[in-house]
Amino acid sequence: MTIMRKSHPLMKMVNHAFIDLPAPSNISSWWNFGSLLGVCLMIQIMTGLFLSMHYTSDTLTAFSSVTHICRDVNYGWLIRYMHANGASLFFICLYFHIGRGIYYGSYLYKETWNIGIILLFLVMATAFMGYVLPWGQMSFWGATVITNLLSAIPYIGSDLVEWIWGGFSVDKATLNRFFAFHFILPFIIAAMAMVHLLFLHETGSNNPLGIPSDSDKIPFHPYYSFKDLLGVLILFAFFFTIVLFFPDALGDPDNYSPANPLNTPPHIKPEWYFLFAYAILRSIPNKLGGVIALVLSILVLALFPLLHTSNQRSMTFRPISQVMFWILVSDLLILTWIGGQPVEPPFIIIGQAASILYFSIILLLXPIAGLIENKLLKW
């Protein structure tokens, strides 16, 4: 008689994905972030569900309903801070996951990579709409500034903005629809993550050497299931340290003031995980140009498979490409810092230089580095 997990239609799917899955024997801890993202998504859906039971999406009561959650609901403060900091944790894992994909050439699995880019856009949209919901000062003005960017689209721009707002300004209709979208999108993300996994399991995982690993596979369980479990425990230790000791470290103090359309905050800025893109947006004086640069800063990821010039897949044995990669990481950190600074010298010129460097490395320098390495190795 066959084992139930190998014969039952539902169990068979789980078995092929998480138990008997043949995995490369040498994948490092950088491969843990996929499972950690799954855990982050589950944390966000569960905490979000409980928050939605007490939250009201009305401009008059939204802010006070969040206050009520923190003060009067049993462990409401914990659920709220887990949800707020869970978003930051989600993006930390997401950026590490993308960085791993770039470093080890995982983007050559084109379908998996492209679904990943769609997932990134969906997560960014969800996080943006979630930030609007507490209806604090930065919520309101962030929503106003970012949605207003769509007015730069020629011909349909202004109509599009009013259509998204549901009126002539960010108001009750906007808050209501943002709540609806913020609730549904994580479930769409979960479905897309399944598709992401489906495409990945068509090819199998990449590995640090970037070479085929068919000759040396091990079962996912118990090896990588326990490895992932260790990753989750480390993640939880880090997560709860932030939630319980520094819950407001990553937030903006302005969001503790209720939204006031008559009073603009001195520095309007998004959450830290969007600052790099915000810096690229601000580095171009033209509104439409800034919006295009903002979209391209993420969409440029789709070009990685086309710009791969090296005869080796991974950067493990490519020192010039490694230097380019770490300069790119440093550049993103500089952009993140600039995004949080006011628009004044010397920050303007630093932001512009960092933005140019960002696109130059991806579109020009890294492909050239790959060609040079091919020549050096006489590959």
UniProtKB/Swiss-Prot annotation:
Query: Keywords in UniProt for this one?
Result: Electron transport, Heme, Iron, Membrane, Metal-binding, Mitochondrion, Mitochondrion inner membrane, Respiratory chain, Transmembrane, Transmembrane helix, Transport, Ubiquinone
Single annotated GO MF:
ubiquinol-cytochrome-c reductase activity
Q: What does this protein do?
A: Component of the ubiquinol-cytochrome c reductase complex (complex III or cytochrome b-c1 complex) that is part of the mitochondrial respiratory chain. The b-c1 complex mediates electron transfer from ubiquinol to cytochrome c. Contributes to the generation of a proton gradient across the mitochondrial membrane that is then used for ATP synthesis.
Q: Name one Pfam family in it.
A: Cytochrome_B
Any GO CC annotation of this UniProt entry:
mitochondrial inner membrane
Task: Please list every transmembrane segment annotated in the UniProt record, as residue ranges.
Answer: 33-53, 77-98, 113-133, 178-198, 226-246, 288-308, 320-340, 347-367
State whether it acts alone or in a complex, and with which partners, per the record. The cytochrome bc1 complex contains 11 subunits: 3 respiratory subunits (MT-CYB, CYC1 and UQCRFS1), 2 core proteins (UQCRC1 and UQCRC2) and 6 low-molecular weight proteins (UQCRH/QCR6, UQCRB/QCR7, UQCRQ/QCR8, UQCR10/QCR9, UQCR11/QCR10 and a cleavage product of UQCRFS1). This cytochrome bc1 complex then forms a dimer.
Q: Which residues bind heme b b566?
A: 97, 196
Q: How does it sit in the membrane?
A: Multi-pass membrane protein
Query: How does the cofactor attach, per the note?
Result: Binds 2 heme b groups non-covalently.
Where it sits in the cell: the answer is: Mitochondrion inner membrane
Q: Which residues are noted in the entry as a ubiquinone-binding?
A: 201
Q: What else is known?
A: Heme 1 (or BL or b562) is low-potential and absorbs at about 562 nm, and heme 2 (or BH or b566) is high-potential and absorbs at about 566 nm.
Which processes are annotated in GO (biological process)? Answer: mitochondrial electron transport, ubiquinol to cytochrome c
Report which superkingdom the organism of origin falls in.
Eukaryota
PANTHER family linked to this entry: CYTOCHROME B (PTHR19271:SF16)
Q: Family assignment?
A: Belongs to the cytochrome b family.
The residues that hold heme b b562 are 83, 182
Q: What does this protein need as cofactor? A: heme b
Descriptive protein name: Cytochrome b
Q: What is its main location?
A: mitochondrion
Signal sequence interval, chain numbering: none
